[in-house]
Amino acid sequence: MAKGKFERTKPHVNVGTIGHVDHGKTTLTAAITTILSKKFGGEAKAYDQIDAAPEEKARGITINTAHVEYETANRHYAHVDCPGHADYVKNMITGAAQMDGAILVCSAADGPMPQTREHILLARQVGVPYIIVFLNKCDMVDDEELLELVEMEVRELLSKYDFPGDDVPIIKGSALKALEGDQSDIGEPAIFRLAEALDSYIPTPERAIDRPFLLPIEDVFSISGRGTVVTGRVERGIVKVGEEVEIVGIKATVKTTCTGVEMFRKLLDQGQAGDNVGVLLRGTKREDVERGQVLCKPGSIKPHTHFTGEVYVLSKEEGGRHTPFFNNYRPQFYFRTTDVTGSIELPEGTEMVMPGDNVSITVKLMAPIAMEEGLRFAIREGGRTVGAGVVAKIIE
C-alpha cells in the first residue's frame, strides 16, 4: 500500500553524477540525500545502499543504476548514480536515465582523468544540456593555487567539448566531510551550494505535452466510409481534431488533416502525450502511410539519412555479436517502430569495433527517418539487438 499520495508541488528535474572512478560520485550522492533530507525532507541514503545498485534492463542491455530522489528549496530531483564506467556508457547512450543536467564529480587531489574527459564527451554526444561541477576531496589539497589550477583544467576540458567552461558553476567541497556533518565551508555548506546551483543553473525542462506534436506510427487501418486511421502512442504534444498534420519519414513528406481522434473506442476532440490513440486522416490512402513514419505538427521535424551517432555495442554475454565489425558494416537501424538498413563508417584510425565497446560512427540510411539530435535507436541483425545508439549530429 502506498504511504500517502505523491505530492507533485515542485517541478521535477532529472540529474545524475558523472566522472572518473573513485573521484567520489557515490559518496556525493549519499551526502546530497543525507544533508538535503534534514532540511527539506525526503530519505537519506547511505553509501552502501547506493553502491549496491540493482540491475536493470534497458533495450535488452543490462545496466546497474542506483536511483535516489531529493528535494531542494524549489524542486524535486530524481538522481542516477552508476557503479561502473561501463554502466555510465550504456546508461547515457540508451537514454535509460535521461538527464536534464549532470553533476560532474572531479577530485581536486587528482584533477581531470581519462573518464572525466570521456564522460564530458559522452554528455556532449548524447545531448546532456547542462553540467555543474563538484570539485571533491578539497580537504586533501592545502594549496589554494593547486585548487585554482584544477578548476582551470576542468573549465578548459568543458570548453573543449562545447560546454560553456567559463560559466559552468564549480562547487568546491568534500563529500566525505559533508557526510560526517562537518560545518566548515567544504562540508555541509558545500552541499547546499550545490543544491542552489542545481536550482538556478539547470532550467526547468519543457514538459512533453508542451512540445510540438509527434506520434510514431505503429499501425495503419482502412475504415470503409471513413478513411485511413493510424495508431500509436503520442510521444509529445497535442493533436486536435481539425488540425493539419504531416506524415514524415521513409517517403516524401505529405500534409493531411486529422479528422478524428479515438481512444479505447471513444471519440475524443484531442490526443495528448502519453495517449494510445487512433488518428483518422482526411483523404489519405491506406498505401500512402506505413509503420515507421511519424505523424507530427507541420514543419516540426525533418527526414534525414546521414548522421553521426554514439553507439554501445552489446557484449557476447548481453546477447550481442561474438565477433567485431568493420568499416561499411551494414546492419538494420531500428528507429521508433521500424528497421531501416544503413551503412556504418568508423572514425579514422579505428580498424574495428569489439563487442562491449562504445564508438562514434557515421551512418547513411537507405531511407529517410524523421530525426532530431538525441533520438535513440537500436542496431539489429536479423531482428536481434546488437547495439544501442543515439543521434549526435545530423549531417543531411
Swiss-Prot record:
EC numbers: 3.6.5.3
InterPro entries membership: EF-Tu_GTP-bd (IPR041709), EF-Tu_GTPase (IPR050055), EFTu-like_2 (IPR004161), EFTU_2 (IPR033720), G_TR_CS (IPR031157), P-loop_NTPase (IPR027417), Small_GTP-bd (IPR005225), T_Tr_GTP-bd_dom (IPR000795)
Gene that specifies this protein: tuf1
Species, as recorded: Aromatoleum aromaticum (strain DSM 19018 / LMG 30748 / EbN1) (Azoarcus sp. (strain EbN1))
Descriptive protein name: Elongation factor Tu
The protein's role, per its UniProt record: GTP hydrolase that promotes the GTP-dependent binding of aminoacyl-tRNA to the A-site of ribosomes during protein biosynthesis.
Stretch list, region G3: 81-84
Gene Ontology MF terms: GTP binding; GTPase activity; guanosine tetraphosphate binding; translation elongation factor activity
GO cellular component: cytosol
